[in-house]
Regions:
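N-terminal Rossmann-like NAD(P)+-binding domain of SDR-like oxidoreductases, especially those catalyzing
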Residues: 1-178
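C-terminal substrate-binding subdomain of Rossmann-fold SDR/epimerase-dehydratase oxidoreductases
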Residues: 18-20, 26, 196-314
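Residue-level signal for the nucleotide or nucleotide-sugar donor/cofactor binding architecture
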Residues: 63, 88, 96-99, 146, ...
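Residues in well-ordered alpha-helical elements
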Residues: 84, 91, 102, 182, ...
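Active-site loop immediately N-terminal to the catalytic Tyr-X3-Lys motif
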Residues: 90, 173, 185-186, 231
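Structural element of the ATP-grasp superfamily
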Residues: 104, 159, 192, 286-287
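A glycine/serine/threonine-rich, flexible loop-to-helix segment
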Residues: 134, 185-195, 254
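Hydrophobic alpha-helix immediately C-terminal to the catalytic Tyr-X-X-X-Lys motif of short-chain
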Residues: 154, 158, 162, 192, ...
Length: 314
């Protein structure tokens, strides 16, 4: 990818999307951001981006967008992503994550073949389902466990099928559980930090033994840019993590930072329906392109915890 390339980002006011856009703008790239401005949109970063000369904002819903501006790459982040919400309102996840992806693929397909951009689908490790031992590879069967992961798996399949049927160039990036600055406080780290700071206990599903792999949003940004620049087209890349933590270990780390006694730091609640025991991926394919995980979780965690701010959001 050249610095002169034009990148369309969908969902660029969301968590990973805003990290990706900030990096692209810092490197002098032209970015066009398509975003619905949902409840989780970062309004502070929206104002920040609008001051940038190489940035354009299109307030639109990916399900209804009817025109794709000129571009060289589409990076498709836009999605509903909170599992609890998918359990209570699965239809919204199906329409946004599946129909929204289909519509974006159709907009690419309608371009003249010489003008069709690369389509990069940002997926999730959750499409594989859980794994008690070992690691999932890109060839592993997709066995999603909840409406969110099922909708993302369906979207991935659409991307592959549009590639085979219509000849679109595509890549799929499947990152591990992301963390970083200014994530909307519905996910484990920001929600738990926000509650503890306000003198309320965090909420822990079950006994906290469920294991997640943690990857910083900046490392995910590196992964996506690496795939765009060096990846083999029509190929899936896992972006995994060397760090696996039980949920209770994450809560313990947050409590230490905020100096909250563990007996006051969290309360156990009934397990989420369809809870996955462990996620883990083999990312040797991505590492062969030169990518590596560079952020250290415990070194990054304190400023993230201290910076949680619900007033940034829509």
């Amino acid at each position: 990818m050249q610095k002169s390339d034009i990148i369309i980002v969908t969902g660029g006011l969301g968590f990973i999307g805003k990290h990706f856009i900030r990096r692209c703008l810092a490197e002098g790239r032209i970015v066009k951001n398509v975003d619905l401005v949902s409840y989780a949109a970062d309004l502070a970063v929206k104002r920040e981006f609008e001051e940038q000369r190489h940035y354009r904002f299109l307030h639109a819903d990916v399900r209804k967008l009817d025109f794709l501006p000129e571009c060289d790459v589409v990076v498709h982040f836009a999605a509903e992503s909170h599992v609890d919400n998918s359990i209570s309102n699965a239809a919204n996840f199906t329409t946004t994550n599946v129909i929204g992806t289909q519509n974006m693929l159709e907009l690419v397909r309608r371009k003249h073949p010489s003008e069709q951009p690369l389509f990069v689908q940002i997926s999730t490790d959750e499409v594989y389902g859980d794994i008690t031992e070992g690691r999932h590879s890109e060839a592993s069967m997709l066995t999603p466990s909840n409406p969110y992961s099922a909708s993302k798996a369906a979207a991935d399949m659409l991307v592959k099928s549009w590639g085979r049927t219509y000849g679109l160039a595509w890549n799929i990036v499947r990152p591990a559980n992301n963390y970083g600055m200014h994530q909307y406080p519905e996910k484990l780290i920001p929600k738990s930090s926000w509650r503890m700071r306000r003198g309320m206990p965090a909420v822990m599903h079950g006994d906290g033994s469920y294991i997640r792999s943690w990857l910083h949003a900046e490392d995910t940004t590196d992964a996506i840019l690496t795939v765009i620049a060096k990846g083999e087209r029509n190929t899936i890349y896992n972006a995994g993590s060397t760090l696996e933590l039980r949920n209770i270990e994450v809560l313990q780390a947050i409590a230490r930072i905020l100096k909250v006694p563990e007996e006051k730091a969290w309360v156990a609640t009934v397990d989420r329906s369809g809870q996955d025991v462990r996620y883990s991926m083999n990312d040797a394919r991505l590492r062969s392109l030169g990518w590596k995980q560079s952020r250290e979780f415990f070194a990054e965690l304190e400023p993230i915890v201290e910076a949680v701010d619900i007033m940034r959001f829509a």
